[in-house]
Amino acid sequence: MGAYRASMASSFSLVHSATLLKNSIFLRRSRVLAFSLHLSPFSTSSATLSSDVLHAHKKSRQPVAATLLELGGVKVARDEIVKDDPTNNVPDSIFSKLGLQLHRRNNHPLGILKNAIFDYFDTTYPNKFTKFDDLCPIVSVKANFDDVLVPADHVSRSYNDTYYIDSQTVLRCHTSAHQAELLREGHTHFLVMGDVYRRDSIDATHYPVFHQMEGVRVFNPADWEGSGKDGTQFAAEDLKKCLEGLAQHLFGGVEMRWIDTYFPFTNPSFELEIYFQEQWLEVLGCGVMEQDILRRNGRTDNVAWAFGLGLERLAMVLFDIPDIRLFWTTDERFTSQFSKGQLGVKFKPFSKFPPCYKDMSFWISDSFTENNLCEVVRGIAGDLVEEVKLIDNFTNKKGMTSHCYRIAYRSMERSLTDEEINDLQWKVREQVETKLKVVLR
């Protein structure tokens, strides 16, 4: 499932950092959302507003020309996605990424990786798996959460973590949002690739838009009868064989190990790790699909497996790409390195511009969240912001809490001037104070 960790992510979340160290790349934080990639009221109600401060003020928008996009065959106007509405938290910076579909570009690292994975399944399972890479990222709250067993009160539903278009519609947090629909349509072997959206921190391995792949295979009783195994055991063994082959296809003859884990939508659940560049790296999350999901979609007698992985995380390792922002650059010095569309090309850095650091201290309010801060900073500085990091905090005798954040500005393509940085920082301070209701120090 795309909900299996892999960004996401935690993709929900399922791969961040060129070295993919266990504690820094495959972060556990989004486990319930992601296999990122998330037990069991199945309510379709949306989460309560957790970012009241942001919604208490009319969003400040940069002037943007009216735009009409086609997303998965659906035509969508900007004002249908970005609204001055208390139930909407989608900024222009996110709208600008819709429809770019980096994963469908054959000469882009994400497209190259996607094609390599598709090639593996086409070769190993000829004419079996149906592939989807152009499904609309606008989905219902029900599809995004309820259909994959995310509880109504789970933190992943909050406005602090998810981009809501309105109270019942979101930008998908994971490719698992399409799982139930595809099962209902009768698909039994499918791969889903797409862009997914999550409000997140700012550093070299996190970005609010990333890409996931979900894989599902459904078995009938006839498939395991006579094998001497029950359906769950049969599916689990088939799943491991499939994914071990995929890991070898991408990384070569590496040592592997399976880790038992927990996901709310699979049982049993596993993580696959490989020993690569002298580190154990988590590659993906997977498991045997919960029977409740199958029953809800008309497959009472079936058993299925599912997996999810994050493309950026794997691509950063396979191509030696050090900063997740590079996937979005149009600089020819980056794009030309992948013009042959081949797996295994190692990225050659073309700039070593130094970062510029600016510190900002303020007294926080009870409603303050770091994701809200990062959203404000990114909305002003865009991809010029490299990292937002908490470097100090304390609480005084009156119970007031102060945070000090260090913001690193750096362009991947050019040197930034002092005047430019100072102007950005001034705007950031102004907007943080106004939108987040903090008191600057």
Residue spans for each PLM region:
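Hydrophobic, Leu/Ile/Phe/Ala-enriched alpha-helical segments that form helix-helix packing faces
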Residues: 117-125, 183, 243-251, 377-381, ...
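Context-gated lysine
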Residues: 22, 58-59, 75, 83, ...
